[in-house]
Amino acid sequence: MTKTYHFIGIKGSGMSALALMLHQMGHKVQGSDVEKYYFTQRGLEQAGIQILPFDEKNITADVELIAGNAFRPDNNVEIAYADAQGYTYKRYHEFLGEFMKGFTSLGVAGAHGKTSTTGLLAHVMRNITDTSFLIGDGTGRGSANAQYFVFESDEYERHFAPYHPEYSIITNIDFDHPDYFTSLEDVFNAFNDYAKQVKNALFVFGEDEQLRRITANAPIYYYGLEDNNDFVAYDLKPSTSGSQFKVRHGEEELGEFQIPTFGKHNVMNATAVIANLYIAGFDLQLVAEHLKTFGGVKRRFTEKIVNDTVIIDDFAHHPTEIIATIDAARQKYPSKELVAIFQPHTFTRTIALLDEFADALNGADAVYLAQIYGSARETDNGQVKVEDLAAKINKKGGLVTVENTSPLLDHDNAVYVFMGAGDIQSYEYSFERLLSNLTNNVQ
């Protein structure tokens, strides 16, 4: 039976993906959000999904309401109206917990790498069998006939609490979201609770000391580079076109695999996918075939060339992610100067990880910083400024603004890596316009 769904905050990455998936399954879908452009809305518009401004007139008794987690009666007219009228609504994660019960579900959790790993798992599975999926880059695909459902499992505010998947990968555990989690132990406890809800098998990165502490009711399989793991990636051959490696499970050689992505972290993500699909009974020859054709996910090492200048856009907003992105860029462009342009995301994270951010960014050849992007969940109380981070960085560079990205032109034979979870893309677009104008003036 088809339903009509109204999404309150439809441009959110998870919300837009869910909207697309339900639309493709034959349901009527609409949603509301702020007017500001967000990268997820292109897919919604291409699908013909209506995006409305927030208005209580959108809330009627005949629609099923799905509300973004950031919206409350005190900051959203639609939530306030729904509460006043006695209309019920489900939060994104509550809806998802119910929805996945109709499938064999495969989750991907972890502090870092979950979007890329979810995208890789979904890509391989959809090319082998009918699969619905939700990826944290705003991509979703729904099929009424799908037996399998692949989804990204988010730890923030323990949103993964309603999820009970058949299988799950956990890529790592790290201290992040200091506006919610109080300590690394608090983060661990959240993941450990989630792990206990996995039904058939759990796949965790064995070189993460926190993940070695995980307990679960289902069997736990460790993957990694070291021999004490259940699934071991070895004979790694990185190149400027990707990575080649072999995997063994105990004494069994599972084969040689290739991925068109860069950095050791992506080899680990692929090993997790191989381990999960091997235990789930998939043909590894087919898995190997489709690993080769993975095109990546949005805002994860997304490359473009503007007038012979290489520009990379990445969502990295935690020190661990910055290190991985710089590592990947070095693998693909070993002879180029690596210029990092970073926008810190949230004041709480910047304060909590100031030294770690500096250490990570010092891995680049030059570092430019944008002003801190504050979250809607917090206020700037003046405790930290981007200049505090700049003072800890020992590479050439400085501060840039959207209006003036010309300092970035001081580099020859460079690859430019724009990183952040805020509006860092506006800085990237400004630099691209600058490059285009320079070329036009020369001609």
Curated annotation (Swiss-Prot):
Major location category of this protein: cytoplasm
Keywords: ATP-binding, Cell cycle, Cell division, Cell shape, Cell wall biogenesis/degradation, Cytoplasm, Ligase, Nucleotide-binding, Peptidoglycan synthesis
Cellular compartments per GO CC: cytoplasm
Annotated binding of ATP, by residue: G110, A111, H112, G113, K114, T115, S116
One Gene Ontology term from the biological process aspect of the record: regulation of cell shape
One protein family per Pfam: Mur_ligase
Pathway: Cell wall biogenesis; peptidoglycan biosynthesis
Gene that specifies this protein: murC
Reactions mediated catalytically: UDP-N-acetyl-alpha-D-muramate + L-alanine + ATP = UDP-N-acetyl-alpha-D-muramoyl-L-alanine + ADP + phosphate + H(+)
InterPro entries associated with the record: Mur-like_cat_sf (IPR036565), Mur_ligase_C (IPR004101), Mur_ligase_C_dom_sf (IPR036615), Mur_ligase_cen (IPR013221), Mur_ligase_N (IPR000713), MurCDEF_pg_biosynth (IPR050061), UDP-N-AcMur_Ala_ligase_MurC (IPR005758)
Highest taxon listed in the record's lineage: Bacteria
HAMAP family named among the record's database cross-references: MurC
Biological role stated in the UniProt entry: Cell wall formation.
Name of the protein in its database record: UDP-N-acetylmuramate--L-alanine ligase
Positions of disulphide bridges: none
Family that this chain belongs to: Belongs to the MurCDEF family.
Keyword Methyltransferase: no
Location in the cell: Cytoplasm
Molecular function in Gene Ontology: ATP binding; UDP-N-acetylmuramate-L-alanine ligase activity
